[in-house]
Amino acid sequence: MKIVAICGSHRKGNTEWMLNKLAERLKENGAEVELILLRKTDVKMCLACLKCEEGGKDRQGICKIQDDMNAIYPKLTAADCIVLGTPAYFDLMTGLLKNFLDRTCAIWPHLEGKSLAGVAVVEEGIGQAIQNIKSYGDICGMKWVGSVTGLAKNPGDIAKDKSVTRRLLKLADKITDIG
């Protein structure tokens, strides 16, 4: 089973920790996992030029923008499951993750039927970050596996919450059971 985890955080902190903890268990369960840190990529904003829509549902990740998405598209289309992680900014996913998701327009027909999971770090409440991720999956025709949210503000806070760790391990098991 191939899993691509996307970290939409601007810093190395709680979201990345959650994705790494999830990836650890997924690997123990025999999955092949790649973590992509969006903060270390060059992913430009979508220009809404619609070049990617040429070819209809047969489109193959053709985007006129030449950046790191060209290397990421094949990883997403080859994955059985995609895990999206984000801290919540004003209750929503980060702009970094939203920008990335906008750029997947070039391949969205190839995401249909894939599994999708989400993790989010929030300072208070649950916010809409996970609902944003789930809505993205619904639009792409993906199968929702589940999510884990954790409360934290400062880097390292989330690792202290043992219930988050337990829920991450359960989510990892659920992902590999489906695959």
Where are these regions (language model features)?
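N-terminal beta1-alpha1-beta2 submodule of the flavodoxin-like/Rossmannoid cofactor-binding fold
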Residues: 1-86, 91-99, 106, 158-179
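A short, mixed-charge helix-start or loop-turn motif at secondary-structure junctions
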Residues: 4-5, 115-116, 154
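Conserved residues at the C-terminal ends of beta-strands
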Residues: 39, 85, 122, 150-151
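Short, surface-exposed, charge-dense and proline/glycine-enriched linear segments
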Residues: 63-73, 115-120, 142-151, 176-179
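Short, glycine-/small-residue-rich phosphate/pyrophosphate-handling segment
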Residues: 94-95, 106-150
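Alpha-helical membrane-embedding segments
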Residues: 136-138, 154, 174-175
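A short acidic, helix-capping loop that chelates divalent metal ions and anchors anionic groups
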Residues: 152-158
